A protein has these predicted regions:
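Alpha-helical segment proximal to the catalytic Tyr-Lys
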Residues: 51, 95-99, 156
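Active-site helix of classical SDR
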Residues: 46, 82, 90
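C-terminal helical subdomain
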Residues: 106, 127-158, 165-167
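Residue(s) in the substrate-gating loop at a strand-loop-helix junction
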Residues: 66
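Active-site loop-to-helix junction immediately N-terminal to the catalytic Tyr of the SDR YXXXK motif
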Residues: 26, 72-80, 92, 120
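Catalytic Tyr-X3-Lys loop
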Residues: 8, 24-43, 58, 62, ...
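Short C-terminal tail/terminal secondary-structure segment
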Residues: 17-20, 71, 148, 159-172
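Substrate-binding pocket helix/loop in short-chain dehydrogenase/reductase
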Residues: 21-23, 30-32, 117, 124-128
Length: 172
């Protein structure tokens, strides 16, 4: 990006789950890959875009974390850890940019029927679904509605916040 680049909105949504296994069985290289994509990827995108937002005195950043980052999931320690890191990054960066008209928020969705489920065992997917009181997966339209509001001018106050969209799985 050059100095003339104007960026108003950044949505960080890349993510991988990795193996469905206990922490002590994780291959270190796979662990690093999950952290690199999910957490370091969010960091790198924010680091690249924030200076342009500061220059323009405006911006909206929405980080897609996960309910796993709040609650943790058995046999998903790397994914859960990476998304917990995204939540902490969101809170810190949101506070750093609060006086610059830049809102930084995260959403913590429960499972949705996307290709990420293909990375998980059927048993793990069923275990995830069993934790959701709504007894269904998140519809992508539900998530995009929340993300659109968070990235709009209508959201002029909320920053450094985490918005739950877990069908009742998380209560905080």
């Amino acid at each position: 990006m050059d100095a003339k680049t104007k960026i108003d909105i950044l949505i960080n949504s890349a993510g991988i789950t990795g193996s469905t296994t206990e922490l002590w069985n994780y291959d270190y290289e796979e662990w690093k890959k999950i952290i690199d994509i999910n957490l370091h990827g969010t960091f790198n995108c924010c680091k690249s875009v924030v200076p342009h937002m500061i220059k323009n005195n405006y911006g909206r950043i929405v980080n897609i974390a996960s309910v796993s980052g709040k609650d943790g999931n058995a046999k998903a320690s790397a994914y859960s850890s990476s998304k917990a890191g995204v939540i902490a990054l969101t809170k810190s960066l949101g506070k750093e940019l609060a006086d610059k008209n830049i809102a930084v928020n995260a959403v913590t969705p429960a499972g949705a029927k996307t290709r990420i489920l293909d990375q998980m065992s059927k048993e793990h997917v069923q275990r995830m679904l069993s934790k959701v009181p709504r007894a269904r997966f998140l519809e992508l339209e539900e998530l995009t509605s929340m993300v659109c509001w968070l990235s709009s001018t209508e959201n002029s106050f909320s920053t450094a916040a985490v918005f739950d969209i877990s069908g009742g799985r998380s209560t905080y």
